[in-house]
Amino acid sequence: MSNRKALLGKKLGMSQVWDENGFFVPVTLVDVSTNVVTAVKTEESDGYKAVQLGYGAIDPTKVTKPLAGHFAKAGVTPRRHLVEVRTDDVDQFEAGQELAADLFEEGAEVDVTGTTKGKGFAGTIKRWGFKSYRRTHGSHKNERRPGSVGACATPSRILKGKRMAGRMGHVTATTQNLIIVSADVENGILAIKGAIPGPKGGIVLVRSAVKGA
């Protein structure tokens, strides 16, 4: 565990910017304008080091009493989303501290975690990339069927993990080693090179890259 930085944000969509060589660079814009530290965990009091972040406004009347007390203790207004990030560098943070987009420098490598788009119930071709049968004489509506999933004698069952039709998407996914193209402190927007998981308006967590280049 190292001195990792993190911000919660909302995916605004994609755009493109010019780089220094005159090429278009595809970027994803992430709003990180309302991040605040709601708690700091230390080894002395909690047994581990971490920082809890809050993001997004919420009606105070819709917050439970325990959470309302938690926010009041930190001296901040209630936040809709909370996340805890492990880091050794907890001394740089304190409850109530606001974090801006300049927490990440331009050119920094980050990992972005979000919830992928839900696709609903999907067949094996769309979900797993199976090959379809030939559309020719004798196939008889087998073009998109999965084929055999378990022989009758051996193994005489369907093994766990068998790739079959089912609900596709709406799972947590992380895209690693993306580059911060720009950090707009005034508007609280990060421009991240490439695509990140999730739809427009989805909540994402931007963290310092765990692997690096």
Swiss-Prot record:
How does it associate, per the subunit comment? Part of the 50S ribosomal subunit. Forms a cluster with proteins L14 and L19.
Write down the SUPFAM superfamilies for this protein, in alphabetical order.
Translation proteins
Asked if the record carries the keyword rRNA-binding, the reply is yes
Listed under GO biological process in this entry are: translation
InterPro entries, alphabetically? Ribosomal_uL3, Ribosomal_uL3_bac/org-type, Ribosomal_uL3_CS, Transl_B-barrel_sf
Function recorded in the entry: One of the primary rRNA binding proteins, it binds directly near the 3'-end of the 23S rRNA, where it nucleates assembly of the 50S subunit.
What UniProt keywords are attached to this protein's entry?
A: Ribonucleoprotein, Ribosomal protein, RNA-binding, rRNA-binding
A GO MF label: structural constituent of ribosome
Q: Which family does it belong to?
A: Belongs to the universal ribosomal protein uL3 family.
Q: What gene, per UniProt, encodes this protein?
A: rplC
Source taxonomy: Bacteria, Bacillati, Actinomycetota, Actinomycetes, Bifidobacteriales
Q: State the name under which the record lists this protein.
A: Large ribosomal subunit protein uL3
What is the organism field in this record?
A: Bifidobacterium longum subsp. infantis (strain ATCC 15697 / DSM 20088 / JCM 1222 / NCTC 11817 / S12)
Q: Which Pfam families match?
A: Ribosomal_L3
